[in-house]
Structure formats: C-alpha cells, structure tokens
C-alpha cells in the first residue's frame, strides 16, 4: 500500500493542477505528491484547447489580489518558458475601439494597466493601428506589448517532468478517474489511494466534486464551447 500513499493528492491534470503540484514540490521537495488525470494524457481538456493567451493584467482592479496575481504570474510564466525552451511569443495585443464612444474609454483602460505596472501601453490612432494589424476595422486601439501567447500543453508537460525530477516518489496518474473520496482516501478506477490532503483542480467538473464533499453551494459551472478555424495562407 506504500506506493499508493501520498502526502498530497491533486485531482486534475491541466495547467492549474500541474502548476499547483510543481509549486508545492519546488517548495517542499520531500513531499510525496500524486496527480490524478482521468484522460489518457495531461492537458486534454481546456488547457490543451484554448488560445494560449498570456494575460497581462490590463483589466483588473489596481491593488486587487487578482491584478497582483496576474502580473506576478505573467512574469513567472515567461521566465519559466525561457528557462525551459517552451514555445511562446510576447507578441503584444491590441484592444480595439470600433467607434468614438469606445475610443474614449481607452484612456481609462491605459491608466488602469499602468497602475497595475504594465509598461509600454500606447493609444493608437487608425493609421498606427493599421500598421500593426492592417485588417482591423476600428477607429483607435490600445497597444499592450507585454501580452503574449504560449503553448500551455507543453508547459503542463514540463511541469510534470520537473515534479518527477525533484521527487521520484511523486507520481502522475493518467487514465485514473477519481470516483469518490473521504477524509483519508481516494477511490479510483485503479484502486484506492491514501491521502489526507487533497486539492481539486478539476476545471468544469469542480462543482460536481464540491457536491461530493457535501459542500453546500448554489453555484454551478456552465461550460461554453468555442470553435477554432485554421485558415489557409494566401
């Protein structure tokens, strides 16, 4: 039973689950951590099927935990990507104003971003906008140079590799679905695991697991599906 006993169990093998596991393992190298993922591979759901945006912290209320967390997280993520040769690009983004009423709001948005520590924010007129994005149809825009994109699936896989390098007793279990749990154990399709500490990073299924823990809440996660199209270059 020793190989099925862990100090901490993390349910969910997406970017949140693996980032949480990596941070814990880095801070406490002797901690024996298990990550449980029901699919055949990590980052199978939202993590591997999104736009890969590195958010800058432009919109959040200055001084709020969310703003500070976003800005600090962006810096840590970019450094981690550089150190580990993860596909990423700090390409910047533009926030488009489609008419004059929206253009007036760009100043406040710029100020908000500057209060959050963003560098290089610039309001663009239509001519400047079209130099960056010739096909944009707005009247003005805010250029946010510190935004970027990253391969989150690759990032998740690197987190997993690092965890096992730090402590070979830690484990990543794929195709291992958590069916039930109590204070001291987890019941899965691969047997029972012993673990007093559990962290749920289960994405769209987090509300269902909360109910299994008898957590009384009126909140319900409603998922929305998006479609991506790959265009042929002309």
Residues of each region from the PLM?
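Redox-cofactor binding/interface segments in oxidoreductases and associated redox assembly factors
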Residues: 11, 56, 200-201
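Gly/Ala-rich phosphate-binding loop of Rossmann-like dinucleotide-binding domains
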Residues: 21, 25, 162-164
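Conserved Rossmann-like nucleotide-cofactor binding loop
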Residues: 16, 41, 205
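Glycine-rich FAD pyrophosphate-binding loop
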Residues: 25-49
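Helical element adjacent to the flavin cofactor pocket in flavoenzyme catalytic cores
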Residues: 142-197, 201-208
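Central helical "cap/lid" subdomain
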Residues: 192-234
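Dinucleotide-binding Rossmann-like beta1-alpha1 core, especially the glycine-rich loop
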Residues: 52-131, 138
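Beta1/beta-strand and adjacent pyrophosphate-binding region of the FAD-binding site
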Residues: 2-16, 34
């Amino acid at each position: 039973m020793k190989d099925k006993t862990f100090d901490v169990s993390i349910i969910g093998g997406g970017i949140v689950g693996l980032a949480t596991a990596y941070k814990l393992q880095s801070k406490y190298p002797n901690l024996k951590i298990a990550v449980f993922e029901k699919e055949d591979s990590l980052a199978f759901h939202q993590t591997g099927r999104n736009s890969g945006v590195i958010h800058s912290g432009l919109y959040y209320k200055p001084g709020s935990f969310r703003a500070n967390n976003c800005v600090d997280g962006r810096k840590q993520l970019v450094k981690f990507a550089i150190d580990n040769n993860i596909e990423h690009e700090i390409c910047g983004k533009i926030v488009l104003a489609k008419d004059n009423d929206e253009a007036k709001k760009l100043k406040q948005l710029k100020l908000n971003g500057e209060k959050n520590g963003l560098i290089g924010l610039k309001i663009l007129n239509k001519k400047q906008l079209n130099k960056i994005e010739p096909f944009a149809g707005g009247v003005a825009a805010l250029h946010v140079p510190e935004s970027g994109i990253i391969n989150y699936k690759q990032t998740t896989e690197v987190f997993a590799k690092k965890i096992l390098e730090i402590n070979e007793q830690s484990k990543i279990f794929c195709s291992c679905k958590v069916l039930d749990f109590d204070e001291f154990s987890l019941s899965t399709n691969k047997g029972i695991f012993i673990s007093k500490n559990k962290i749920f990073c289960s994405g769209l299924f987090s509300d269902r697991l909360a109910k299994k823990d008898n957590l009384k809440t009126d909140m319900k996660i409603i998922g929305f599906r998006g479609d991506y199209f790959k265009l042929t270059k002309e």
